[in-house]
């Protein structure tokens, strides 16, 4: 497991701007990675790490299908302030994690394998799990297995029954997702549209999501999405049935 320790948080003066305070409070205490394994090769799974590394039990927060671990920055910062260790991974092909060689590996068994590698690297006997959509699905699978280290689980935007209409909509959105954007603002406007179910969020949060959803590519003079379009492989065929777990 690899750790890169960020700069320690500095005390802010009374005159510090709200933007500066926001940026500092949303800086992870550590950033690290573990190695996952597919049938063909190893790959790097990146994560942010908040709070005390010696906390008795870690909280693992796992994002939805096209998102990344920085979605949980606000929650992670708040929980770390209460003495918890919070780890937020990027699933393969998202955020700072490596993309997979074979697009067919973007599937639930691989995600569960990668998260098991992360749990083992953390060394926590017990963990709490917070999962959104796909992250919740992974959590349910891991929590249901004998000997699971998952002791408590909080899930949203997912359940044991997945209606086919929702799967169709998700697949359509994924296939139509832009690969790059001219500006951060363009990325933000796109996210505001496709993530409208997130609810009424403040402007600073939408901006935060956008900043961590793209990466500037100087050779192409554009912002590239930090989501591998090949994850759409699972939706290559139309869904004509609901999924009952």
Regions from the language model: what does each represent?
Residues 1-59, 81-84:
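Alpha/beta-hydrolase fold catalytic core
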Residues 61-64, 88:
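Structural cue for short, hydrophobic secondary-structure segments
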Residues 64-67, 133:
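Active-site glycine-rich loops that stabilize anionic/oxyanionic intermediates
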Residues 66, 91-95, 160:
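Alpha/beta-hydrolase active-site loop signature
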Residues 74-76, 81, 87-130:
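Active-site loop/oxyanion-hole signature of alpha/beta-hydrolase fold enzymes
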Residues 125-166:
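Conserved hydrolase catalytic core segment
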Residues 158-186:
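A catalytic-pocket lid/entrance helix-loop region that shapes and gates access to the active site
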Residues 215-245:
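Conserved serine/cysteine hydrolase catalytic core
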């Amino acid at each position: 497991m690899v750790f890169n320790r960020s700069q320690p948080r500095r005390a802010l003066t009374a005159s510090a701007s709200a933007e500066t305070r926001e940026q500092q409070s949303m800086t992870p205490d550590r950033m690290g990675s573990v190695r996952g394994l597919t049938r063909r090769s190893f790959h790097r799974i990146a994560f942010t790490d908040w709070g005390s590394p010696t906390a008795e039990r870690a909280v693992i927060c796992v994002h939805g299908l096209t998102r990344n671990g920085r979605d949980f920055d606000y929650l992670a910062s708040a929980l770390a302030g209460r003495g918890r260790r919070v780890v937020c991974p990027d699933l393969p092909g998202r955020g700072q994690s490596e993309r997979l060689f074979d697009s067919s590996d973007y599937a639930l068994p691989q995600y569960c394998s990668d998260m098991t590698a992360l749990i083992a690297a953390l060394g926590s006997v017990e963990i709490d799990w917070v999962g959104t959509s796909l992250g919740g699905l992974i959590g349910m699978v891991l929590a249901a297995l004998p000997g699971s280290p998952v002791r408590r689980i909080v899930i949203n935007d997912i359940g044991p029954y997945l209606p086919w209409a929702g799967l169709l909509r998700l697949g359509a959105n994924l296939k139509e997702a832009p690969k790059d954007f001219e500006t951060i603002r363009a990325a933000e406007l796109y996210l505001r549209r496709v993530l409208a179910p997130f609810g009424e969020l403040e402007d600073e949060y939408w901006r935060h999501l956008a900043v961590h959803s793209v990466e500037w590519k100087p050779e192409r003079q554009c912002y590239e999405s930090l989501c591998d379009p090949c994850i759409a492989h699972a939706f290559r065929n139309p869904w004509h049935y609901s999924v009952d777990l």
